[in-house]
Amino acid sequence: MPVIEEIDDIDDIDNLEMDLAELDSTMKTPVAPKIVPTVVRSQDQEEEAYSAAISGNAGSGSGFNFVNSTTGQVEKSHSLTKEELDEIKEFQMLYPCYFDTRRTHAQGRRAPKDLCVENPLAKTIADAARSLGIPSIFEGSKTHPQDFGNPGRVRVLIKENGKPFVSGIDNKRVLMKRIGEYLKSHPTTLESVKQLPYGPDFDNVEPKKIPLLKGTAMNDIVPLHSPYLTQHPMTKSLYDAPPPPPPAQQVSAPEKQMKMPKNKFRVVRR
């Protein structure tokens, strides 16, 4: 005979009015919308922490870095007003990969091949713009999607109120040609990367050449806050020494089996 069970706690009773879509994320009903699962990857959190550290150490922060037209040094700006930010929108951007002779046009190169150099840096591009009298803004932590290992970009003001800021430089093509000529006469060295305002965290970091990866367009001289030098979790395994191969085991040749001698006598039937 069945036994009737008494239930004292009302919370123990199944809620039959619950919408099924709240239990099954693949269902969608008029009552409850489809539940979209949230995926949080550990590398995303590492990337955010890394970007925040670089923004603080490289001197980019929330403002911009202006290049002093007299000294050529990169100086951090104060907080910009809305009017100043609107003026900056008229500036055009230049990335180092535009002048990289190791790259093809599909890999990000924009300047003519004969005016491109190896290991272009954003700081040298800013120096070239300064020498031409072009106002420039240096952004140390910004990177091109195809050149993430060489951080830095430069904003330049070519025209103001529709008129060229410098006579003879009417457009971006002409400016890139003049900058390419400057880069040709100012090749990148290990001392060049020390001119950036990295901050105290990079005082003991020495610039060094990095090995080039086969099939990858990249610099072998990069700024000190490059992911190639800071052991970023996404790139630190690129240059780890491969494990040594296991010792070769001497395999003895199999012994030859003795074959039975052939019977060379013919049997003649009578």
Curated annotation (Swiss-Prot):
Keywords: Cytoplasm, Ribonucleoprotein, RNA-binding, Signal recognition particle. SUPFAM superfamilies: SRP19 (SSF69695). Pfam families: SRP19 (PF01922). GO terms for molecular function: 7S RNA binding. It is found in: Cytoplasm. InterPro entries: Signal_recog_particle_SRP19 (IPR002778), SRP19-like_sf (IPR036521). One of its GO terms (biological process) is SRP-dependent cotranslational protein targeting to membrane, signal sequence recognition. GO terms for cellular component: signal recognition particle, endoplasmic reticulum targeting. Coiled coil: none annotated. Gene3D superfamilies: Signal recognition particle, SRP19-like subunit. Its main location: cytoplasm. Residues 259-270 have a biased composition (Basic residues). Residues 237-270 are annotated as: Disordered. Fungal signal recognition particle consists of a 7S RNA molecule (scR1) and at least six protein subunits: SRP72, SRP68, SRP54, SEC65, SRP21 and SRP14. Signal-recognition-particle assembly has a crucial role in targeting secretory proteins to the rough endoplasmic reticulum membrane. It must be involved intimately in the translocation of a wide variety of protein substrates. Belongs to the SRP19 family. This is Signal recognition particle SEC65 subunit. It comes from Kluyveromyces lactis (strain ATCC 8585 / CBS 2359 / DSM 70799 / NBRC 1267 / NRRL Y-1140 / WM37). The gene is SEC65.
